[in-house]
């Protein structure tokens, strides 16, 4: 039999991840799961559209 503390810890982490993702989905229900971060929902999200031209300019 495996260590019961390890099993309980793994189950706790799995539930924490599940409920954390559910809370994020509830916070922004219109968000497309395949799209990037929504800047309106997350003001600290990285603006990739603004970074892409700069990266192209730097990398050539």
Curated annotation (Swiss-Prot):
Keyword check for Glycosyltransferase: no
GO biological process, one term: defense response to fungus
Record PTM Leucine amide, positions in chain: 59
Subcellular location: Secreted
Keyword Transmembrane found: no
Range of residues in the leader sequence: 1-27
Pro-peptide region(s): 28-45
Extent of the AXPX repeats: 27-30, 31-34, 35-38, 41-44
Protein family membership: Belongs to the MCD family. Mastoparan subfamily.
Protein name as it appears in the record: Mastoparan-VT4
Organism of origin: Vespa tropica
């Amino acid at each position: 039999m495996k260590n019961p503390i390890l099993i309980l810890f793994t189950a706790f982490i799995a539930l924490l991840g599940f409920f954390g993702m559910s809370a994020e989905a509830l916070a922004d229900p219109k968000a497309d799961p395949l799209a990037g971060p929504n800047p309106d929902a997350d003001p600290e999200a990285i603006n990739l559209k603004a970074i892409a031209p700069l990266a192209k300019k730097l990398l050539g």
